């Protein structure tokens, strides 16, 4: 594994290896055991999309691994002033040991990997969010012990989260049910991938149907960054796609709820459900740190 570009590229073995290492790193951190696995290494962090959790978790993770993280905003790079991505990739490869990029276009991430000579980590694109899904899988296994026999239900926008959850959960052996409005379905490439799993994958526009017998229920905001102009239109389209008591009544009694945050309470999830599952949601947020540290060690050590 040379890069982390999208979940579609990862094998089940690679996913499990990262989760196992993430568990180990989490244990060591909690018990004060140093792990300077990236001592002397430098990670460049490119942010075309702002983020609290991504920046803090990667920067803190590199510090705990005894490496150095360098924040690069769009204003710090020549890409915004016309330099081709392939040139930026080749220059940064001479200075850094790895790049994490959070941006809009998946192609930009793929181009960095193609033209650079160092590991590239996808911190989020409009197509996928692999770091978040690794944290989600880590959290699910932490609370449920294994993936065997579990069903994951996602309700809401068929966005980067849905795309990555479908692939990641199917690859580790879970069943997957997705409920989205017809005009907001996941990417065709992802649906084609899921089709090979037969009845382990269900696509519907009925949230209650998707939530039936679910062990894990997940949602995301209705309007992602860059879609603020569509907020009112999306509120109408996603009316009825809220995680609430009615939805949770369809899931198993001990079902988990996850949300990648930030949450818009009383839109995609009620405050009551959010607070009832806050322990799981904030453990998921913490696990971004541990999962991303595992990714960096695997790619950069």
Residue ranges and their predicted role:
Residues 97-168, 259:
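Anion-binding alpha/beta catalytic cores of soluble intermediary-metabolism enzymes, centered on
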Residues 1-56, 60:
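Positively charged, low-complexity intrinsically disordered leader regions
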Residues 254-255, 261-301:
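Adenosine-phosphate binding glycine-rich loop
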Residues 48-60, 142-219:
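Glycine-rich phosphate/diphosphate-binding loop of Rossmann-like nucleotide-binding domains
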Residues 195-271:
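Rossmann-like adenosine-cofactor binding region
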Residues 42-43, 47-95:
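Active-site cofactor/substrate anionic-group-binding motifs, chiefly glycine-
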Residues 92, 112, 209-210:
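Structural alpha-helical scaffold elements that stabilize or flank donor/cofactor-binding regions
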């Amino acid at each position: 594994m040379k890069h982390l570009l999208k979940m579609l590229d990862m094998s089940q073995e690679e996913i499990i290896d990262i989760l196992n290492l993430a568990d180990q790193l989490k244990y060591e951190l909690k018990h004060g055991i140093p792990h300077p696995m990236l001592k002397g290494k430098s990670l460049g962090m490119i942010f075309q999309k702002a983020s609290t959790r991504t920046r803090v978790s990667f920067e803190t993770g590199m510090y705990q691994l005894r490496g150095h993280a360098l924040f690069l905003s769009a204003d710090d790079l020549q890409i915004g002033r016309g330099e081709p991505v392939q040139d930026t990739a080749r220059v940064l490869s001479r200075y850094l040991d790895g790049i994490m990029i959070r941006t809009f276009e998946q192609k930009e991430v793929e181009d960095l990997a193609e033209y650079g000579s160092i590991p590239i980590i996808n911190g989020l694109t409009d197509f996928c969010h692999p770091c978040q899904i690794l944290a989600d899988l880590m959290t699910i296994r932490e609370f449920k012990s294994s993936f065997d026999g579990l069903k994951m239900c996602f309700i809401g926008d068929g966005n980067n989260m849905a795309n990555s959850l479908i692939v990641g959960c199917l690859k580790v052996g879970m069943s997957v049910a997705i409920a989205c409005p017809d005009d907001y379905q996941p990417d065709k490439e992802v649906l084609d991938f899921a089709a090979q799993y037969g009845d382990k994958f269900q696509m519907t526009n009925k949230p209650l149907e998707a939530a039936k017998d679910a062990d894990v229920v997940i949602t995301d905001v209705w309007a992602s960054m860059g879609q603020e102009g569509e907020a009112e239109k999306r509120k109408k389209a996603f009316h009825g796609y809220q995680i609430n008591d009615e939805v949770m009544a369809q899931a198993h009694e001990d079902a988990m709820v996850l949300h990648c945050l930030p949450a818009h309470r009383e839109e995609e999830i009620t405050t009551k459900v959010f607070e009832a599952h806050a322990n799981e949601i904030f453990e998921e947020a913490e696990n971004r740190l541990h999962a991303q540290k595992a990714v960096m060690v695997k790619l950069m050590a």
